[in-house]
């Protein structure tokens, strides 16, 4: 039995199964267009042709949101002028809900929500997205550092729905720490203990002191 709200997505999946394209399509909604989000969108635009020809990956940015409004096109947005599109949408918009905006992807196959904010409001919609079969990739640390039960629920929902909940950049300044630990566990290793200086600031200070830089100069 297929829920009515999942009918369109199901038809898209069946269509792809019977009429396979040579390219895999990934539909992406980027929330946050500050330093991180803007760089991500620029990289996607620059690498679009390379990903398509070398990886057979058609990466469509179908949605972009800032703190005030969002733009959405299921066929893919033009990234060269997305800031102007956001301004135009902001001028004519009558209210804005990031949850409603992101859930427009619910009927798109292979849909991914990318959170480049530090917003508690945005992180609060992850569960709804995962329940609607939308993967979540986040640089926002709030959800993964929230109550443990909520964190486990997010991971379990992603597993049950066959989608991804990824947060690699939450720790280690973007180093592949979480992925490495997962690979070790998946290959049968048992993690007994992890020792680390978890503060990036302290790591910087220690490195400077080790290079004989005076403490007073290091923290200046």
Where is each model-derived feature located?
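Conserved anion/nucleotide-ligand pocket segment
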Residues: 180-220
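Short acidic, glycine/serine/threonine-rich loops at helix termini
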Residues: 2, 39-43, 72-79, 148-151, ...
């Amino acid at each position: 039995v297929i829920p009515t709200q999942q009918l369109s997505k199901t038809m898209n999946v069946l269509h792809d199964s019977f009429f396979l394209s040579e390219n895999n399509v990934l539909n992406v909604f980027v929330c946050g267009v500050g330093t991180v989000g803007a760089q991500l969108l620029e990289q996607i635009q620059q690498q679009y042709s390379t990903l398509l020809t070398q990886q057979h990956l058609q990466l469509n940015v179908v949605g972009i949101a800032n703190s005030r409004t969002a733009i959405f096109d299921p066929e893919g947005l033009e990234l060269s002028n997305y800031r102007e599109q956001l301004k135009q949408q902001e001028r004519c918009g009558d209210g804005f809900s990031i949850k409603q905006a992101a859930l427009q992807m619910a009927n798109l196959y292979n849909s991914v929500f990318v959170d480049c904010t530090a917003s508690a409001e945005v992180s609060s919609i992850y569960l709804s997205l995962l329940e609607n079969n939308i993967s979540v990739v986040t640089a926002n640390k709030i959800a993964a550092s929230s109550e443990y039960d909520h964190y486990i629920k997010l991971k379990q929902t992603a597993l049950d729905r066959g989608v991804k909940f990824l947060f690699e950049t939450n720790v280690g300044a973007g180093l592949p720490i979480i992925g490495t630990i997962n690979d070790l566990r998946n290959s049968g290793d048992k993690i007994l203990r992890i020792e680390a200086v978890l503060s990036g600031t302290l790591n910087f200070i220690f490195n400077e002191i080790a290079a004989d830089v005076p403490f007073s100069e290091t923290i200046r």
